[in-house]
Amino acid sequence: MLYYALVFLVVALIAGVLGFGGIAGASASIAQVLFFIFLVLFVVSLVMRLMRKV
């Protein structure tokens, strides 16, 4: 449990540095692009799995 608390602390510190450092705008647009890429890949893999079952 303590391990997860430390992991979340490190993630929060990194997010705070990026948020207050001015990189937030660039990283938000990159995250948005990555979200849509992985969403498309998820849908494609889901369709391929359904096609394989039939």
Curated annotation (Swiss-Prot):
Keywords: Cell membrane, Membrane, Plasmid, Transmembrane, Transmembrane helix
Spans traversing the lipid bilayer: 5-25, 28-48
Pfam family, one: DUF1328
GO CC entries: plasma membrane
Bilayer disposition of the protein: Multi-pass membrane protein
Domain of life where this protein originates: Bacteria
InterPro entries: DUF1328
Localization per Swiss-Prot or TrEMBL: Cell membrane
HAMAP family given in the database record: UPF0391
Family: Belongs to the UPF0391 family.
Protein's name in the database: UPF0391 membrane protein pRL90066
Annotated organism of origin: Rhizobium johnstonii (strain DSM 114642 / LMG 32736 / 3841)
